[in-house]
């Protein structure tokens, strides 16, 4: 059994899957909008139907799934899992994403500032502090590119995403 939840924003959505070892999920490209994935714990193997090879999920890593958004994908849990997906609302809209680095005490926005793109910070885990405000899992904030942001990860995980 898997529990699923979705949190919508006007620019993207977050989907959450929590399940047990052995569970199988099949996603049709008409329903698949996940372009990045972060595993809190556990995981499994995912592959594109009728293609060789698979991707093995990794805990604490932001996985880039953009190449698979238009494909039929099957996932089998090799252990109990808790996964958060970053979803585009428009498959023709590209997003770039990365995790904030453990040693990043000021949010590095130099490249994004040059591009002047809409940017969001998302809390995947823990209780990081951004400009003296504590975030919790699933919180997100639009980044004002004219400001600087002080970061204390506190063993948490923050994702930085911008439309490209």
Task: Please name every model-derived segment.
Residues 1-164:
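Jelly-roll (double-stranded beta-helix
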């Amino acid at each position: 059994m898997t529990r699923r939840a979705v949190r919508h924003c006007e620019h993207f959505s977050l989907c959450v899957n929590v399940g047990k070892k052995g569970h199988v999920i099949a996603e049709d490209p008409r329903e698949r909008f996940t372009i990045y994935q972060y595993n809190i714990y556990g995981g499994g193997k995912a592959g594109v139907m009728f293609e060789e090879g698979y991707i093995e999920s990794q805990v604490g890593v932001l996985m880039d799934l953009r190449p698979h958004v238009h494909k039929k994908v099957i996932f089998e849990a090799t252990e109990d899992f808790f996964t958060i997906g970053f979803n585009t609302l428009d498959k023709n809209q590209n997003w770039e994403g990365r995790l904030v680095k453990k040693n990043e005490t000021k949010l590095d926005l130099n490249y994004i500032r040059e591009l002047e793109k809409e940017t969001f910070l998302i809390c995947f885990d823990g209780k990081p502090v951004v400009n003296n405000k504590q975030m919790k899992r699933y919180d997100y904030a639009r980044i004002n590119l004219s400001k600087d942001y002080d970061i204390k990860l506190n063993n948490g995980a923050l994702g930085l995403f911008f439309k490209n």
